[in-house]
Swiss-Prot record:
Cellular location(s): Cell inner membrane
An example Gene Ontology molecular-function term: proton-transporting ATP synthase activity, rotational mechanism
Domain of life: Bacteria
Main location: membrane
This protein's encoding gene: atpF
Organism: Flavobacterium johnsoniae (strain ATCC 17061 / DSM 2064 / JCM 8514 / BCRC 14874 / CCUG 350202 / NBRC 14942 / NCIMB 11054 / UW101)
Designated name of the protein: ATP synthase subunit b
Pfam families named among the record's database cross-references: ATP-synt_B
Transmembrane segments: 8-28
Described purpose of this protein according to its UniProt entry: F(1)F(0) ATP synthase produces ATP from ADP in the presence of a proton or sodium gradient. F-type ATPases consist of two structural domains, F(1) containing the extramembraneous catalytic core and F(0) containing the membrane proton channel, linked together by a central stalk and a peripheral stalk. During catalysis, ATP synthesis in the catalytic domain of F(1) is coupled via a rotary mechanism of the central stalk subunits to proton translocation. Component of the F(0) channel, it forms part of the peripheral stalk, linking F(1) to F(0).
Family the UniProt entry places it in: Belongs to the ATPase B chain family.
NCBIfam families cross-referenced by the UniProt entry: ATP_synt_b (TIGR01144), PRK14471.1 (NF011041)
GO cellular component terms, A-Z: plasma membrane; proton-transporting ATP synthase complex
């Protein structure tokens, strides 16, 4: 440091200072504007990139919100379809049960009617056979008892007596 102070030359200092000032003026005149434009352009590029990133982020959030909304709607629609399918299944089961009960009841009523009809027919047939059999027995008994003249006259007199009483 002492050597620099001892070897100091004012002329050299002047020329170096003058060259530095001229260099600075030339830089300001010719290079400062392009450097500043480059820095400004770089700042604008960074600012635009940040804005684009922010816009992309917002758009991504909107897309995610839309995706979530669409997913929720799809789930709600699926749940509604499942609920409707369950209701249809339950309705079909209930309808089938009702139809089966009605068919069973109808068959029971038809069977009862058929049984009643068969019973009435059997009773009529039985009555017919009993009356035929009774007539046959009565005819045989009457033939047996009325085989002689005396019993025939007694019967006729008795019947005439009954008719007078009535």
């Amino acid at each position: 440091m002492d050597k620099l102070i001892n070897d100091f030359s004012f002329g050299l200092f002047f020329w170096q200072a003058l060259i530095l000032v001229i260099l600075i003026l030339l830089l300001v005149k010719f290079a400062w504007k392009p450097i500043m434009e480059s820095i400004t352009a770089r700042e604008e590029g960074i600012k635009n990139a940040l804005l684009s990133a922010e816009n992309a982020k917002r758009e991504m959030e909107n897309l995610q919100a839309d995706n979530q909304r669409i997913l929720n709607e799809a789930r709600a629609e699926r749940d509604a379809m499942l609920k409707e399918a369950r209701e249809m299944k339950e309705k079909m089961i209930a309808d089938s049960k009702n139809e089966a009960q009605e068919a069973g009841q109808k068959m029971i009523e038809q069977a009862k009617a058929a049984i009643e009809s068969e019973k009435n027919a059997a009773m009529a047939e039985l009555k017919s056979q009993v009356s035929t059999l009774s007539l046959s027995i009565a005819e045989k008994l009457l033939k047996e008892e009325l085989s002689n003249k005396e019993s025939q006259t007694k019967l006729v007199e008795k019947m005439l007596g009954d008719v007078k009483l009535n």
